[in-house]
């Protein structure tokens, strides 16, 4: 049995994809980049914005900073809650894990203050013992926000912790910290092949499947 379950936010707890994609489209238009199919921006959901703008669209460092500025100007005002919703079964999952004594943590590359706004908006903050996110352009990578949470909570036995996320970055970040990871497919922003490629420890289709893994895994 695990004692801690670390959760990604976007695409794992909430479907924030519509707002993220809207804001990315607005930012990219400032550079003359038109997006014909919104699905082309699904990879935006997961990695740090700087990596997405650089790797997907070839923006240099200066323009990456501008793109992030344009993105956040739109997202913070218009998109943080637009089309955003809690996935079916998530609240039941969190309630069940809390009732079983599992400590719950959010580990997201989203700025911490925005993560808190989203969790507060959906009345989910009450389930979490700690929220770890990016702060002032620090801790922007998944392995960094996970490491920060581990340090803050003074967790020494890594076998007590499992990560839950919807993208390969969650699996990779967890592994860099010595943790196992559950890859979730219900969000619709990842694929089975993506998780197989990075060797996710578990791959699930429904939120409540997480309970059996957290409670049934032998780690002693």
Residues of each region from the PLM?
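Helix-loop "lid/cap" segments that line or gate small-molecule binding pockets
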Residues: 27-28, 48-61, 118, 149-152
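Short, acidic loop-to-helix structural element flanking the phosphoryl-transfer center
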Residues: 77-106, 112, 116
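Acidic, Mg2+-coordinating phosphoryl-transfer loop and its flanking beta/alpha structural elements
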Residues: 163-202
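Active-site neighborhood of HAD-like aspartate-dependent phosphohydrolases
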Residues: 1-43, 57, 191
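Metal-dependent phosphoesterase signature
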Residues: 54-91
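Structural recognition of alpha->loop->beta junctions
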Residues: 122-132, 194-212
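A short, structured active-site edge motif that brings together acidic residues
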Residues: 125-140, 160
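Conserved Lys-Pro-Asp/Glu-containing loop-to-beta segment of HAD-superfamily phosphomonoesterases
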Residues: 4, 142-171
């Amino acid at each position: 049995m695990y004692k801690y379950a670390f959760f990604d936010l976007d695409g794992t707890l909430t479907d924030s994809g519509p707002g993220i994609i809207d804001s990315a489209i607005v930012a990219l238009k400032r550079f003359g980049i038109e997006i014909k199919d919104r699905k082309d921006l699904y990879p935006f959901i997961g990695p740090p914005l700087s990596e997405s703008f650089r790797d997907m669209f070839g923006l240099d460092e200066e323009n990456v900073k501008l793109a992030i500025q344009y993105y956040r100007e739109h997202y913070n005002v218009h998109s943080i809650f637009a089309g955003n919703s809690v996935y079916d079964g998530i609240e039941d999952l969190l309630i069940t894990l809390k009732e079983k004594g599992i400590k719950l943590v959010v580990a997201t590359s989203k700025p911490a203050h925005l993560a808190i706004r989203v969790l507060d908006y959906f009345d989910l903050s009450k389930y979490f013992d700690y929220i770890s996110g990016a702060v002032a352009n620090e801790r922007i990578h998944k392995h960094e926000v996970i490491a920060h949470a581990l340090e803050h909570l003074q967790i020494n036995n890594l076998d007590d912790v499992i990560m839950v996320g919807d993208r390969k970055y969650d699996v990779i970040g967890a592994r860099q910290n010595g943790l196992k990871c559950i890859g979730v497919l219900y969000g619709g922003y990842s694929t089975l092949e993506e998780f197989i490629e990075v060797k996710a420890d578990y791959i699930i289709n429904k939120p409540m499947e997480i309970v059996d893994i957290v409670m049934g895994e032998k780690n002693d």
